[in-house]
A protein has these predicted regions:
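Conserved active-site alpha-helix within GNAT-family acetyltransferase domains
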Residues: 91, 115-133
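Short amphipathic alpha-helix that is part of the acyltransferase structural core
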Residues: 2-41
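A short, internal acetyl-CoA/4′-phosphopantetheine-binding micro-motif in the GNAT/acyltransferase core
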Residues: 78-86, 113-114
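A conserved beta-strand-loop-helix scaffold within acyl/acetyltransferase catalytic domains
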Residues: 34-81
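Conserved acetyl-CoA pyrophosphate-binding loop and the N-cap/start of the following alpha-helix
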Residues: 84, 88-96
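Polar/charged side chains located within well-ordered beta-strands of beta-rich proteins
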Residues: 19, 25-27, 55-58, 64, ...
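Conserved GNAT acetyl-CoA-binding A-motif
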Residues: 101-113
Length: 133
């Protein structure tokens, strides 16, 4: 698993450092459909999530969340920047969160994968998920 920073609390963030990094990445990025990511995901959104029982993991080249508010923790919003894809970082982000969930006393989690999102579907190769229809 790559070196990561875990944030469970809004006050925990080092804003001079983290905010600049996140803004730099978001301002440059467009999603798979060419839309500006900054319009989809913002710092106020991050602040809301951290104040409402989510965990945020920031690594060089990507990030991911866990939403702890459901019956089973929900692995959501995993993102790997294009230059870091196909190098195992996406799988590392899945395993990082699975380890956190087990450490939190759970043995089940949920993840939603859209059929169109081919890169995200690659986690099914890990043989740790069961497809539900």
């Amino acid at each position: 698993v790559p070196k990561f920073q875990e944030f469970n609390d809004w006050e925990q963030m080092k804003w001079n450092e983290v905010q600049i990094d996140i803004l730099r990445e978001l301002n440059q990025f467009k999603d798979s459909f060419g839309k500006d990511w900054f319009k989809e995901w913002t710092l106020p959104d991050l602040k809301y999530r951290l104040k409402n029982n989510w965990s945020f993991y920031l690594v060089e080249g990507g990030w991911c969340f866990i939403d702890w508010n459901r019956k089973y923790p929900y692995l959501c919003n995993r993102y790997v920047f294009p230059e870091h894809r196909n190098k195992g970082l996406g799988s590392d982000l899945v395993w990082l969160r699975c380890n956190e969930i087990v450490e939190g006393g759970y043995n089940t989690a949920m993840i939603k994968l859209e059929d169109w999102n081919t890169p995200a579907l690659s986690v099914m190769k890990e043989n740790i998920f069961t497809k539900m229809d």
